[in-house]
Swiss-Prot record:
UniProt-recorded name of the protein: Zinc import ATP-binding protein ZnuC
Keyword Ion transport: yes
Listed PROSITE patterns: ABC_TRANSPORTER_1, ABC_TRANSPORTER_2, ZNUC
Disulphide bond pairs: none
EC number of this enzyme: 7.2.2.20
Reactions accelerated catalytically: Zn(2+)(out) + ATP(in) + H2O(in) = Zn(2+)(in) + ADP(in) + phosphate(in) + H(+)(in)
Length: 269
């Protein structure tokens, strides 16, 4: 099945009769970064669970390369403040991992200095790096990163995005990255997929160029970030359902966008 690591074909998922995902097509190849964006309730978590094999779709197919190894970075990690868990002990919860391997993974992500510290005492940015290091310990062919920059300031986000790109280049792994932010995504992303229960559109992100103050403020970091501008030729009602109609026919709470503009090589789903 060509070079794909994972391929979703017309995937649909419903809960209690309510469609959460409909007709989703998605493929991730080695060395490719795919960023999934969309509002809360768009079905991003459901799609990730389908990719990971934790959820079987009601419709369609999820194909994975045989014996595919996946490294997963969760959106959040809650650790009880009274639990005596160091970063090292946390990483060694991965079967077969020794101290040297844990330290090497932390060095990869620039967090070797937190090896012996309590997990609860490290900063938000350090925690994200530890979670990324844990995902790398599996030597993954596919990295699945759920909100990898959550709780990190904008400058820290740029640094983490740049690190993810370097890891992709070093290991040649595919990357599926999830964000709820419809405006800020990686410039290194090969494909952006806009999801709102179905694939609204997909394509390459546009580079940040319209705001000189942003470039001046972040310098090199600004080149690691992109804003993906798009308008859809359809609208969604309050329940996320697609409405293909003129503005006069739309129910209250629905916005109509009469134009349809995408960046280069953008394909509408």
């Amino acid at each position: 099945m060509d070079n794909a690591l994972v391929r979703l074909t017309q995937v649909g998922v419903s809960f209690n009769g309510q469609a959460v995902l409909s007709d989703v097509d998605l493929a991730i190849e080695p060395g490719q970064i795919v960023t999934l964006i969309g509002p809360n309730g768009a079905g991003k978590t459901t799609l990730v669970r389908s990719v990971l094999g934790l959820l079987k779709p009601h419709v369609g197919e999820v194909w994975r390369r045989p014996r595919l190894t996946i490294g997963y970075m969760p959106q959040k990690l809650h650790v009880d403040a009274t639990l005596p868990l160091s970063v090292l002990r946390f990483l060694r919860l991965v079967p077969g991992v020794k101290r040297e391997q844990a330290l090497a993974a932390l060095r990869e992500v620039g967090a070797a200095h937190v090896l012996e510290r309590p997990l609860q005492s490290i900063s938000g940015g350090e925690l994200q790096r530890v979670l990324l290091a844990r995902a790398l310990l599996r030597k993954p062919e596919l990295l699945v990163l759920d909100e990898p920059v959550q709780g990190v300031d904008v400058a820290g986000q740029a640094e983490l995005y740049r690190l993810i790109g370097k890891l992709r280049d070093r290991y040649g792994c595919g990357v599926l990255m999830v964000s709820h932010d419809l405006h800020l995504v990686m410039s290194a992303t090969d494909q952006v997929v806009c999801l709102n229960r179905h694939v609204c559109c997909s394509g390459h992100p546009e580079q940040v160029s319209g705001d000189p103050a942003f470039v001046e403020l972040f310098g090199q970091d600004a080149r690691s970030l992109a804003i993906y501008h798009h308008h859809h030729d359809h609208a969604h009602d309050l329940h996320g359902e697609v409405v293909k109609a003129g503005p006069g026919a739309l129910p209250p709470g629905t916005r109509f966008t009469p134009v349809h503009k995408h960046g280069p090589d953008c394909n509408h789903g």
